[in-house]
Structure formats: structure tokens, C-alpha cells
């Protein structure tokens, strides 16, 4: 669907933009060459090369955008292998083991307090899970939106004045691709933090630590987009 939108809806618009840019380039070149009085053969050759490059970029727009995300996917896949091998933890297993070892030593009052804390933390975790899901699906939708309009900014790359539009668009694409890497790093840090809970001797501390680390993870995921754009200077 995204490719059909890009090729059937946006490419005709991009074709009009390229036509307007090439006409503007021709008029500018003629004016710079004293109204055709100082025009040589290299003038037409340079103009023809620029037009061919612009059309070729437009025809390969979808392939170029997908190649950028293929590179990003390769980076994320390699990062996932490194992170999963060095920082893997099962939160449920860790907390269950702590509960089984400490519940028998607690009184009624402590159990009631622990039950209330558990319900509060469980509610917070569900809210954080929803927010994390929003971040991940929001990034996926943003990628689809970026790809669907790719021909329009690519059509401006051949012009010196309008080329900044296409350059910023490509930077934004690279930022989206590298955002996945930052997300994996955040998850790896979260796993390392949660792994430290295994040595905690207090259930109350463990519960609130998991909640705090999940809040940190959620906040970090929200910041990955702006961080990726700032690293690549995308606007």
C-alpha cells in the first residue's frame, strides 16, 4: 500500500516539481550567461546531466529509502544479538523467587501492605506498557508516512536552493532508521538495571525499583526520536 501511494500519488507531484525546478534552472543559467551570448556546449551537457540525475533519483526513490532502513535493520539486529547475550533477565522469575523466599516470614500487616503496593505497581506497569507500545507503533507509523511522501523531497535534490528540503528529509530517514538502535540500547540498559534486583533483599525495594526502572525506560524511549535527530542534525 505504501509503495502504491508513493508511486501512484506522489511521483506525479514530484514530476511536476522536477519540471518546475528544471525550468527554473534553465532560466537561471540563461540569465547567468548573458542571455545566451556566452553559452557553450558544456552548458547543455551540464543541464542534461542534472536532469538525468534528477529523474534517476526520482525513479529509484523507494529503493533508496528502503536501503536506508535495511542498513538500520542490520544495525538493530546486530545490536540485539549483543544486548541479549550480555544483558538478559526474566523479571517475573526474579520477583517470583523473591516472593517465595520472603512471604513465609511476613506477618498479616506486612502482607496487606505488600498486596496494596503490588496492585499499585501493577497498575503503573500496565500504564507504562501502554505508553511503550504507543512509542513503538508511533515510530512504525512515522516510518510509513515518511516513505509514502519520499518522491516529493527527493525531487528537490537537484536544485541548489531547494536541495535543503531533500537533504533534511534524508537526514530524517536516517534518524528514524537509527532510532531503532537507540531503542535497543535503552532496552539493554533496562535489562541491566533490572538484573540488579536479583541481589535486593527487600520485596518492597524490588517492587518499586522495577516500577522506577520501567518509568525510566518509558521516558528514554520517548527521547530516542529527538536524540537520533540531534545526532544526525535532522530538522
Task: Give a label for each model feature.
Residues 169-177, 215, 219:
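Transmembrane helix-bundle signature of multi-pass membrane transporters/permeases
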Residues 17-55, 149-163:
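Hydrophobic transmembrane alpha-helix segments characteristic of membrane transport
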Residues 154-171, 199, 230-231:
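Alpha-helical transmembrane segments
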Residues 1-17:
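Binding/recognition "hotspot" determinant
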Residues 15, 19-31, 183-198:
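Juxtamembrane "helix exit" motif at the C-terminal ends of alpha-helical transmembrane segments
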Amino acid at each position: 500500500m505504501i509503495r502504491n501511494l508513493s508511486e501512484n500519488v506522489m511521483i506525479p507531484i514530484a514530476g511536476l516539481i522536477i519540471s518546475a525546478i528544471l525550468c527554473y534552472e534553465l532560466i537561471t543559467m540563461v540569465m547567468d550567461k548573458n542571455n545566451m551570448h556566452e553559452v557553450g556546449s558544456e552548458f547543455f551537457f551540464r543541464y542534461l546531466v542534472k536532469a538525468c540525475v534528477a529523474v534517476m533519483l526520482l525513479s529509484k526513490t523507494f529503493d533508496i529509502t528502503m536501503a536506508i532502513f535495511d542498513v538500520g535493520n542490520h544495525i538493530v539486529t546486530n545490536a540485539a544479538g549483543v544486548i541479549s547475550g550480555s544483558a538478559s533477565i526474566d523479571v517475573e522469575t526474579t520477583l517470583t523467587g523473591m516472593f517465595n523466599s520472603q512471604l513465609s516470614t511476613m506477618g498479616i500487616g506486612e502482607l496487606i501492605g505488600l498486596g496494596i503496593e503490588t496492585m499499585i505497581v501493577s497498575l503503573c506497569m500496565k500504564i507504562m506498557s501502554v505508553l511503550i507500545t504507543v512509542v513503538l507503533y508511533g515510530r512504525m507509523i512515522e516510518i510509513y508516512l515518511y516513505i509514502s511522501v519520499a518522491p516529493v523531497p527527493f525531487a528537490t535534490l537537484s536544485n541548489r536552493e531547494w536541495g535543503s528540503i531533500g537533504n533534511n528529509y534524508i537526514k530524517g530517514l536516517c534518524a528514524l532508521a537509527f532510532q531503532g538502535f537507540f531503542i535497543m540500547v535503552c532496552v539493554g540498559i533496562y535489562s541491566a538495571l533490572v538484573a540488579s534486583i536479583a541481589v535486593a533483599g527487600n520485596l518492597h525495594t524490588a517492587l518499586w525499583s522495577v516500577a522506577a526502572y520501567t518509568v525510566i525506560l518509558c521516558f528514554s524511549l520517548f527521547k530516542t526520536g529527538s536524540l537520533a535527530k540531534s545526532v544526525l542534525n535532522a530538522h
